[in-house]
Amino acid sequence: MALEQTLKKDWYSILGADPSANMSDLKQKYQKLILLYHPDKQSADVPAGTMEECMQKFIEIDQAWKILGNEETKKKYDLQRHEDELRNVGPVDAQVRLEEMSWNQGDESFFLSCRCGGKYTVSKDEAQEATLISCDACSLIVELLHQS
């Protein structure tokens, strides 16, 4: 399943979880829901329409766990989700290259001062994939350009 195809769904809300939930909480919510909607757990006298809804919900829950239950796919999903949120917030104020940003050895991140006095910050790991970075003090956004 391609991650791009699944970004339209909010996998956290499908599991009834907060995006800041840890892996243990996500697993607990998944297990609770999967038991509730598992086709084998439904009674035989459930109407066909309801059974189909339960099956669809079961599939969605399983898909959510396949993405959120794996550290690598969860990280990619979270990053893309964050970028989508930024894209919906407002227009890009500027385009910058990583070389234009300063290095913070303390927390191993790159940063750039914003005209409001705040900072655009991106971790070393996120810098490889991130394209949009929001200011920590205002609504401005910069686009991080990657070398081609």
Swiss-Prot record:
Subcellular compartments: Cytoplasm, Cytoskeleton
DPH-type MB domain span: 92-147
GO terms for biological process, alphabetical: positive regulation of ATP-dependent activity; protein histidyl modification to diphthamide
GO cellular component: actin cytoskeleton; cytoplasm
Binding site for Zn(2+): C114, C116, C135, C138
One Gene Ontology MF term: zinc ion binding
Associated pathway: Protein modification; peptidyl-diphthamide biosynthesis
Keywords, sorted A to Z: Cytoplasm, Cytoskeleton, Electron transport, Iron, Metal-binding, Transport, Zinc
SUPFAM superfamilies: Chaperone J-domain, CSL zinc finger
Description of the deletion phenotype: High embryonic lethality at 14.5 dpc. As early as 10.5 dpc, embryos are smaller than their wild-type littermates. Embryos that survive long enough to initiate digit formation show one or more additional preaxial digits.
PROSITE patterns, sorted: DNAJ_2, DPH_MB
Superkingdom of this protein's organism: Eukaryota
InterPro entries: DnaJ_domain, DPH_MB_dom, DPH_MB_sf, J_dom_sf
Domain J: 10-81
Transmembrane segments: none
Main location: cytoplasm
Organs and tissues of expression: Detected in heart, brain, spleen, lung, liver, kidney and testis.
Entry comment, domain topic: The DPH-type metal-binding (MB) domain can bind either zinc or iron ions.
Oligomeric form and interacting partners: Monomer and homooligomer. Iron binding promotes oligomerization.
Entry-linked PANTHER family: DNAJ HOMOLOG SUBFAMILY C MEMBER 24
Biological role: The iron-bound form is redox-active and can function as electron carrier. Stimulates the ATPase activity of several Hsp70-type chaperones. This ability is enhanced by iron-binding. Plays a role in the diphthamide biosynthesis, a post-translational modification of histidine which occurs in translation elongation factor 2 (EEF2).
Family note: Belongs to the DPH4 family.
Protein name: DnaJ homolog subfamily C member 24
Protein species of origin: Mus musculus (Mouse)
Lineage: Eukaryota, Metazoa, Chordata, Craniata, Vertebrata
